[in-house]
């Protein structure tokens, strides 16, 4: 199967393990996604599949361009609101996929698997340097004017260089950035509800669009994990 799915963030909660440990988890509604197109190295220069998620009704289908609608019409699939292209390195896996195939969460992911989650962070509007860049701020004593406690301070010199360098940390818009959180662990898969329980937090607000993919940095070795857990158990 493909290595990733489009998902929606539902919110955060907590679960308890058999040992009684409390784990914070994020609940994701992942898929089911439909294969819209298959790309091959012979025709397109690389191997990939394009998946779609979130059907668009006839009322809103007119917002798409004719070329966009033509892609779905050629594949014989419904019109989707979100599409994502996934590179596929395994030629055998690519050969098994075809337009119209449905990818469900239990076919793509399993428990204890490592994943990468990409999304857009929450927008926080115009913020100062202390919130945006974690700057320390000026001294809180009588030598500093009250208005300058949270200011950026000096941003350059005099004639040399005679300018403010590009990339200087200044006040500005904070958030709405594309961020990928790597090596998160799946602690639960509920196939009947298309849900993924992911340990930790993921980018964005509730109902935000996410892309969940297999971790690029590899999966943990099962034997090694079992050895670490065995050593961590307290001796009675």
Swiss-Prot record:
Signal peptide: none annotated. InterPro entries: Ribosomal_uL3, Ribosomal_uL3_bac/org-type, Ribosomal_uL3_CS, Transl_B-barrel_sf. Keywords: Ribonucleoprotein, Ribosomal protein, RNA-binding, rRNA-binding. Residues 139-163 are annotated as: Disordered. The keyword Ribonucleoprotein applies. GO terms for biological process: translation. HAMAP family: Ribosomal_uL3_B. This is Large ribosomal subunit protein uL3.
